[in-house]
Amino acid sequence: MPINFLSHLPYELAIQIVLAIADLRTISKLNLVSTRWLLVSRDDQVWKPLYLTHWRHATPPRTLQTLQRAQRDWISLYANRLLLERNWREGNVAARFINGHADSVYCLQFDGERILSGSRDNTVRCWDYASQTCVRTFEGHEGSVLCLQYDERYMITGSSDTTIIVWDFASARKIATLREHALAVLDIRFNADIKRIVSCSKDCTIKIWDLDSLKCLFTLNGHQAAVNAIHLHGTTIVSASGDCSIKLWDIRTGSLIRVLAGHTRGLACVQFDGKTVVSGSNDKTIRVWDATTGECVRVLEGHEALVRTLCFDERRIVSGSYDLTIKVWDRVTGELMVDLKDAHASWVFSVALDGGKIISASQDRKIVIWDFTVGVKHLQDLIY
């Protein structure tokens, strides 16, 4: 008669044996062996570490309530996260459209609940994500709104009218208009923790502002063409220019830290997470850089026109192009995962990424929500 040795082991040791297997197919078959195996193979002490191992870059749930729910059913969370990743790999996506702007939509930001969009119609609109309805309109610029960033207190916008406007986000009230750039303001970033705003312009300069006084502290002159995009992480600014270069700057001193060279035509977009810089160019490529060494570690090829916009998280890089496509790349391998062809009827100007969704904006006036959470349950509990 076979002996069920597991019944004689301490339960915690049985858990460790199952974790050592680390093969999902084998673990899933354990429940056929005995009731004891069934209990062990479905225990949260097995599935929580498996979840966090497979998605090791995951950040904590947003609330304690979510954490308490998540701790109770890790096997369900694992199954739903697996489905979400399968949707990404296989391109299982549902598209929804937001219409309301009277002209091209140049920029957007998405926080999971709201979409903010800036347009050639000179306005910024705030959309409720769930209903896709416009709940607030910001009017004040005399030209296209080319860039924006907001938090719960402020929204800051830059325009082709050469100005920057600082808004009270809750009331849509204009706090101040900043007039230091000579040409269009192409990108804007701010960090409320260090009280700094950074702007870049077609006038080839980068300006650093004090968020409290709204005074321009200094101007960075280093690029030889329009500075098309910037990103701010901590005290480091990354700038991308039509002169084909990427520059890293110290926001505290304005000193140049490093130059990244490799693109053969002007740059249109850049993102930075503190360690990695990802850039898109008119040479039709995306480059991934080690910010510490300045080395280009990967080149992503596949777009057939200028790479106008991109964003990334721990697992994916999303890019939008003048070839009318949005592409999703595996950040680790560089493999093209999803190719959303004819995503828009015209140039793609902006993309945002949040968990299982991409938001895109285009010259065709549309905002599109690309939802990869089709069939995924307990989405609010998943840890990204």
Descriptions of predicted regions:
Residues 93-96, 133-136, 173-176, 215-218, ...:
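A structural motif specific to WD40 beta-propellers
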Residues 54, 98-105, 139-145, 179-185, ...:
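WD40/WD-repeat beta-propeller blade N-cap
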Residues 118-121, 158-161, 200-203, 240-243, ...:
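Conserved strand-to-loop turn within each blade of WD40 beta-propeller repeats
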Residues 1-7, 19, 24-125, 371-384:
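Intrinsically disordered, low-complexity acidic/Ser/Thr/Pro-rich linker and tail segments
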Residues 108, 124-128, 148, 164-168, ...:
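WD40-repeat beta-propellers
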Residues 349-384:
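Blade-level signature of beta-propeller repeat domains, shared across WD40, Kelch, NHL, RCC1
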